[in-house]
From Swiss-Prot:
Places the protein is found: Cytoplasm
The protein's role, per its UniProt record: Catalyzes the ATP-dependent phosphorylation of L-homoserine to L-homoserine phosphate.
Main location: cytoplasm
Name of the gene: thrB
Full protein name: Homoserine kinase
Organism: Symbiobacterium thermophilum (strain DSM 24528 / JCM 14929 / IAM 14863 / T)
Reactions listed under catalytic activity: L-homoserine + ATP = O-phospho-L-homoserine + ADP + H(+)
Signal peptide per UniProt: none
Pathway: Amino-acid biosynthesis; L-threonine biosynthesis; L-threonine from L-aspartate: step 4/5
Keyword 4Fe-4S carried by entry: no
Annotated positions binding ATP: 87-97
Amino acid sequence: MVRVSVPATSANLGPGFDTLGVALELRNVIEMDETGIDDVVIEVEGAGAGALEDPGRNMVYQAARLVFQRLGYEPNGLLIREKVAIPVARGMGSSAAAIVGGLVAANALVQKRTGGPGLDREELLRMAVAIEGHPDNVTPALLGGFTVSCMDPDRGPLYLCFPPPRGLRAVVVMPEVQIKGRKTEQSRGVLPAQVSLRDAVYNLNRTALLVAAVAQGRTDLLRVAMQDRLHQPYRAALVPGMRSVFEAALSAGALGVALSGAGPSVIALVAESAEPVALAMEAAFQWAGSNARSLTMDLAREGARVLSGPGREQDMLDRPPHWG
């Protein structure tokens, strides 16, 4: 059996639409093994239990199947156990975690059974992006840290990873808002086909500032660097109270605030006490008519990990540069 942990992620971080992402220290654990019986059995505990056990709808299995096909390996029956801590369809990278977890677990299982090298980090990332359609969540889910990524038509996904500034934490507040239909498609559907040059320059300024601020540990710049005009103003109608929640977070001491991915969750970055920020954001959502709950977590410096035993972790991917 192999065990893999994979982190939640938050994409965009305000201005970096489909480009920026960060890994969060909230993890799903996936166990995978051959059973000797010609069948696929999926067990899910936590978020998604009762809805994700069908192999045809399970992203972990669908991703794993692609690895087996790529490596020419036919498992002798398959058991997948998922302990799901990442909320589903809340803007915290649940689909990216499932995809990356399935790829990494299947790769590790084939390595264990055959003794072969399996797929390297770059191959796994290319597969993850091909499944997900964009790199902003799957890159930090696989690699950890703060990531900048883009797609090149010739070279595929290109990325850089940065360690998150020390002491920075995330408060994620999840309103009880249901976005009709498929969440990501609905959230993209409200975006305009064109934006003004003024707004495009505004976002370029802040995306560049945000990357530099993270790289240099200038958390004092996050308030401005996480501002956006490209997607959040248009998605506000899908998240009642969003602007008030942003204002409440900043007034309570957050360093910066943004929609988490396509929403409806909102992420605030904090350096000191997280509780006042979480309470203020929850209250703002409640004032707007939505109950909400919050999670406070560290930013994850590591991405998907193969767990080699109780309490021990083994990185079976090529590691990014040492971050200290």
